[in-house]
Amino acid sequence: MIWDKSTIQLPDGRIEEATTPLIISASRRTDIPANYSVWFKKRLKEGYVGWKNPYNQKVSYVSFDKARLFVFWSKNPASFFPVLPALDERHLNYYFQFTLNDYELEGLEPFMPPLAKRVETFQRLSLRIGPEKVVWRFDPLFITGELSPEKLMQRVESLASQLSGYTRKLVFSFADISVYRKVERNLRNASIDYCEFTPELMNEAAQMLEIIGKKYNLELRSCCEAIDLRGYGIQPNKCIDDDLIRQLFSGDPELMNFIGGQETLFPGKDNSRYLKIKDKSQRNDCGCIASKDIGEYDTCPLGCTYCYANRVPGKTHPIGR
């Protein structure tokens, strides 16, 4: 997606070119709501953000001038509540991808608050902005020699019961360990006895998830998975989702013009509009539409052992610009 360009003035007076996206992802690369709420509020006030390419170290800029939607990704947005009024005052649309896992016994998320506190934050956010705007992610589904799919699904169901009425959708993925060598190395260094999901185990988990989804009235979606789980009522997800945007923000003409304001009369027959705005920079099995991510790799201090966005756990730097 080629977004429009504009110019911004930096504090030192320099004029720089900036991309002006309609949809902003904050962020697949780092947990901005958990760690950088003050930074984000300042950037929102300034109207732009700088982003450093991790490979060539070049800084590029993203302007918020035309932004109509922020999609936030977080495991613990407790400190982000003071930012919400600033978004509302600017009439900016937003929703959250809230990852709420239960790996306390395994220590896979060492710097997370206690699970009960995170559940409370989820419920509070849902009451503040509405359950349809807080998408629950149990992501990734992770198994070990001790944590079988059956035990894992017991944890998923426990959370589903606590989140009943506070969300409409459960999104999951199966841990991709061998795909990311740094993740494999980090798990090995942490002495985690991990197991890979085979197609048989994926189907076994999907069967149990189907039961949980029906019991707690949750839409089930898989994220970036090649395996077809539609037989269990599980559709491929679009985390940055034109259908959800259409449902939540139909009164925003700019968003509707971008995604197409009406659904196709015969779904699946004409998806030319979706294909035009699909984010081609993501993995093949990703269904997201185009957005601009404003996070930086190696800036999340939460230390999750399975994280792909930090090269070395515990060695991060603050997000800048």
What residues fall within each predicted segment?
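Long, low-complexity, charged/polar intrinsically disordered accessory regions
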Residues: 254, 258-265, 296, 312-316, ...
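C-terminal/domain-terminus segments
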Residues: 228-240, 302-305, 311-321
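Conserved C-terminal portion of the radical SAM core fold
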Residues: 117-184, 208-225
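Surface-exposed cleft-lining segments at the edges of enzyme active sites
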Residues: 104-112, 140-150, 188-198
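Local cysteine-cluster metal-coordination motifs and their immediate loop/turn environment
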Residues: 283-312
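Conserved Radical SAM active-site core
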Residues: 1-109, 115-131, 311-321
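A C-terminal junction/extension of Radical SAM enzymes
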Residues: 200-284
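Active-site-proximal loop/turn and secondary-structure-junction residues that shape catalytic pockets
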Residues: 30, 76, 100-104, 140-142, ...
